[in-house]
Amino acid sequence: LSRWTSYLDPQWGLGPKGLLPRALTLMVRATHHECDNTVCKLVSGIYGLGHPTLWSHEHLNPQTHEWLKQEFARVPLSFFRQMLESLSAGYMTPVDGYRELPQDVALRRPQTDARFVFMTGRGNRCFLAESQQRSYEALSRYRRGYHSLHVLPGYGHLDVFLGKNAPWDVFPLILAELNRPLPESTR
C-alpha cells in the first residue's frame, strides 16, 4: 500500500480521485452495509475491523452522523506501522522520530503523579476495552486506588463522547472523576 500512498483518507468517501482511492472506496462500500455514509464506512475500514468501528450507530443522531463526513481526514500509514510495532512488542512503542523516549516505557514505574481515568465502551472495536483494562492494571500496580477504569456497556469508541445520550450516560461520570479528590496518601 505504501508504494501508492503515504496515507488513507476517509474524505475519499465524498469523491475519490485516483485509482487507489476509488478502489478502496468501492471495497468499503461493498463490505460495509451498516449505513449509507461512505465517510463513516471508510472510517470503520481504516481504524479497525468493526461494522462500525468507532461508534454504535444507535447512539448517533442523524445530525452527528452527517457531521462525521467533515470530521475525519488523512491518516498517515506511519500510524499503522507504529500500531503493528506496538502489537508485536505488547505495549505502546515510541513513534518514529521520537526514539529518545524510552523503549520500555510501559515496563517501568510511571514518571508522573498524574491520575489516569480510563473510559471506554465495551463495544469499542478500535481499541478493545481489554487494552484499557490492562493499562489500568499496569498503573494500579504502582498506585492502588489512585486511577479509575470505566467500561461503558453498549458504547463503542467515540460515541462515548459523541453519542446522543452521552450527556446523561457519560458526562456525569467525567465530571465526577474531575471532581474526585485525590486519596489522602497521595497528596
Model-derived regions: residue spans:
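Alpha/beta-hydrolase-fold enzymes
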Residues: L1-Y98
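Short secondary-structure boundary/capping segments
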Residues: S2-R3, Q133-R134, A166
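Soluble or luminal CAZymes and related metallo-dependent hydrolases
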Residues: V75, F79, S131, A166-V170
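Conserved beta-strand elements of beta-rich interaction domains across eukaryotes
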Residues: L87, G123-N124, G156
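The feature captures the conserved acid-bearing segment of alpha/beta-hydrolase catalytic domains
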Residues: E100-D113
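Short beta-strand/loop motif that positions the catalytic acidic residue
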Residues: T112, F118-T120, N124
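Conserved alpha/beta-hydrolase "acid-adjacent" motif
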Residues: R125-R134
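Catalytic active-site module of serine/aspartate enzymes centered on a nucleophile-bearing elbow/loop
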Residues: Y136-E137, Y142-R187
